[in-house]
């Protein structure tokens, strides 16, 4: 659906579930509701808060639902990490698109007298990191993968970096696969609160997800209407 069609679908569905109210949402408010619904939809499909607690790639439908936001190679090129005090850092702000959720990562590893090989990154909880670094059976290795976790970027505390703990390995480029932030839908005809504006922007998620997002927007709107402070 185009953004215009999503607005129409929203109005029709809202009228069915909230027919007792004569209140109406304006264009800017419907845009906001659709974008809020999009955020909820993405988090559910990624696995953060879906009721079945299933992850992103558990079912083909979840993979399809977020396929247009899932960034992989070659769209996302390898990034050369910086090395400080034996730890490699990859600022997520250096990715091609605005990062939202991590899905998978790998890194080029150089071993003496062997050709460069690409190994999977292996996430380690911060609480377990110290023990893992001291444990020879749990450290980064060419058989078990390379340890990493997330933290504040060293160059900008408002952003996040991936920190990689190579052990005795020498690392090259890092390859991150991730869910990017979606474009914000915008119907047009108005100006944002900050004075900015943009051209008409349709939803970039797959077509088959649009009706579900409108349903979610109607659910959010219904909750607003039913709230005692709504006038």
Where do the protein language model's features map onto the residues?
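Glycine-enriched, solvent-exposed interface loops adjoining structured elements
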Residues: 1-231
